[in-house]
Every structure is written in structure tokens, then in C-alpha cells.
């Protein structure tokens, strides 16, 4: 039987090819690091439950997207139905950092009229001696776009949990404040299953009818 969860958040992980998107997701969802990882073709799907507060769990649907240009038309279709995302670059590959702006602009075009909460992720921080992007300039770019910045390593399991849980908590706070709402026809946020809780007026009416019988 599936564990109980309060909400389901659909997340998307984007960035250039070879920045380590699949490795990061597999470390988070499966607890393992693959030394050799085949390039993602189109989109792959993963899921995991995260407990953000005692007794409050969020189900994450995580979409791993291909970074190659020839798959962009496929991955763009998933932007609109995502509420959050990790935007990855490789700290040893300056070009992948320079392309962050392009990824963000592309996302803005395809998510309308909704919004995506992003965290900027500098991946492969275990290769610090090969760094081509300083933490300072990455933090500056993230601040310019209103994003958090975090550095991770799938190989050494550094900040992998933190990247996903911080993003989940940020989305959860926006949902609690009513700044992000569940909307018909949008898959970004869905209400979960909580026992002994009436979720709609229709359910109340059904309950009252049963009592009158």
C-alpha cells in the first residue's frame, strides 16, 4: 500500500548534457552513484517521498530531461506541468554555466501562465581542483534571478538531499501561503491522500446523506 502524502509536487531537472542530472537524481531516489551513465533520451521519470515536517510527507515526481538540443522539443512539453526545478551546471565546465540564462529564458516561455520555483545547482563539487566557475559568481547569478544556489556531488553524496528538500520546502511554503494553488488541468501540484479528512463540500453532502438514511 502506498504511503500517505500531503501533496504531490512535479519537479523537473534541466541543464546541459553531461552536467550530471541523471546521476544526481539516482543518488537522491535510489541512493546509488552510477560510474557510467547513458545519456537520457527524451525524458525519464523518478519518484520519492520527502518528509518536510514531522508526519508531513510530500511525494515528488521528478522528471529527468535530456540536455541535447535534438530532444529539446520533447522536454519543453514538460515545463508547463512542473512546479519546481533544479537547474544544473557543471562547475568544471564554464560553458554549462554560461548556458544557465538560456535555460531560464526558455523555461519562462513554456511555463506560462504558471511559474516554476528553481534552485541553481553547481554540480560535481568533488572536482573542486578543476573548477571553472567560482562560488561567488554562481551565487551572484542565482541572486539576480531570485534563486537559491547550492553545490552538490552525486559521486560523494554532497548536498544531494539538501538540494531536493530545500526546493520542496520552498514550494510547500508558497502553497501554504496560497501563492501556488492546485489548478484544474495543471499537474504541478496535486492534493494527496490523508485519512479521515474531508477534502470537498461534495464529500460532506455525501456523508450527510448517509447519516439521514
UniProtKB/Swiss-Prot annotation:
InterPro entries per record: P-loop_NTPase, Rab39, Rab_GTPases_membrane_traffic, Small_GTP-bd, Small_GTPase
GO molecular function, one term: myosin V binding
EC number(s) stated in the UniProt entry for this protein: 3.6.5.2
Effect recorded for residue 22 to N: Dominant negative mutant
Pfam families hit by this protein: Ras
Catalysed reactions, as listed in the record: GTP + H2O = GDP + phosphate + H(+)
Lineage summary: Eukaryota, Metazoa, Chordata, Craniata, Vertebrata
Tissue expression remark: Highly expressed in the brain.
This protein's name: Ras-related protein Rab-39B
UniProt source species: Homo sapiens (Human)
Amino acid at each position: 500500500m502506498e504511503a500517505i502524502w500531503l501533496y504531490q509536487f512535479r519537479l523537473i531537472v534541466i541543464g546541459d548534457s553531461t552536467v550530471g542530472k541523471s546521476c544526481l537524481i539516482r543518488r537522491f531516489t535510489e541512493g546509488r552513484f552510477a560510474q557510467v551513465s547513458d545519456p537520457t533520451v527524451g525524458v525519464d521519470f523518478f519518484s520519492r517521498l520527502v518528509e518536510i515536517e514531522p508526519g508531513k510527507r510530500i511525494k515528488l515526481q521528478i522528471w529527468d530531461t535530456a540536455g541535447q538540443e535534438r530532444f529539446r522539443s520533447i522536454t519543453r512539453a514538460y515545463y508547463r506541468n512542473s512546479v519546481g526545478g533544479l537547474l544544473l551546471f557543471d562547475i568544471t565546465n564554464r560553458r554549462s554555466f554560461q548556458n544557465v540564462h538560456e535555460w531560464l529564458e526558455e523555461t519562462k516561455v513554456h511555463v506560462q501562465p504558471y511559474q516554476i520555483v528553481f534552485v541553481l545547482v553547481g554540480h560535481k563539487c568533488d572536482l573542486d581542483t578543476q573548477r571553472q566557475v567560482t562560488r561567488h559568481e554562481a551565487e551572484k547569478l542565482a541572486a539576480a534571478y531570485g534563486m537559491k544556489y547550492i553545490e552538490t556531488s552525486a559521486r560523494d553524496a554532497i548536498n544531494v538531499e539538501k538540494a531536493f528538500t530545500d526546493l520542496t520546502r520552498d514550494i510547500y511554503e508558497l502553497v501554504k501561503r496560497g501563492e501556488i494553488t492546485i489548478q484544474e488541468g495543471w499537474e504541478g501540484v496535486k492534493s494527496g491522500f490523508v485519512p479521515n479528512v474531508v477534502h470537498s463540500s461534495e464529500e460532506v453532502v455525501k456523508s450527510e446523506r448517509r447519516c439521514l438514511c
